[in-house]
């Protein structure tokens, strides 16, 4: 049986299996014209979601669940999405790690192929943080379940891969992580 016959959600990723050819047939003229006529709307929506990640969370918030963000948390998310680096001093219990990880999730959805790393003193700490926040986010925002291709967690390593080839993994704040490259840490 060829790879083309497999049409299972986790096995049909063209990026991970070069022998796979999409089972999707090309669009007819009518469907293509409809897609083309709405392309500007899709582009505007993605641009809006990239610029206002807090409002995107409000949009995908389920009827029961989700969180209500404060204005300073909204500002934190917007700055994290718009700039490569930022500096802030926040108190304990302000949900810094949660907001950082959920902003990574949103960026992974809207920037295909981006690579993030969550860092902590050790890889074990970073792995535990990412696992806890991953579970918390999926509980509060089940929409992200459809965007995640695979999530692997072990004692000293963690990786979340998205369907658009973006990923989040962990690094330690130590000399053992020197030379490892990511788009954003």
Model-derived regions, located:
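Phosphate/NTP-binding elements of NTP-utilizing enzymes
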Residues: 1-185
């Amino acid at each position: 049986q060829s790879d083309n016959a497999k049409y299972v959600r986790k096995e049909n990723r063209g990026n991970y299996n070069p022998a796979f050819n999409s089972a999707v047939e090309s669009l007819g003229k009518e469907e293509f014209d409809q897609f083309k006529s709405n392309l500007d709307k899709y582009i505007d929506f993605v641009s809006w979601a990239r610029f206002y990640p807090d409002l995107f969370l409000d949009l995908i918030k389920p009827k029961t669940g989700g969180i209500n963000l404060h204005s300073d948390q909204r500002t934190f998310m917007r700055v994290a999405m718009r700039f490569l680096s930022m500096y802030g001093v926040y108190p304990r219990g302000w949900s810094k790690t949660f907001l950082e990880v959920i902003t990574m999730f949103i960026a992974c959805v809207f920037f295909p192929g981006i690579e993030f790393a969550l860092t902590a003193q050790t890889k074990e700490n970073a792995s535990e943080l990412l696992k806890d926040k991953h579970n918390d986010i999926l509980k509060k925002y089940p929409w992200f379940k459809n965007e995640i291709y695979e999530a692997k967690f072990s004692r000293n390593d963690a990786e979340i891969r998205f369907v658009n080839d973006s990923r989040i993994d962990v690094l330690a704040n130590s000399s053992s992580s020197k030379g490892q490259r990511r788009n954003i840490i």
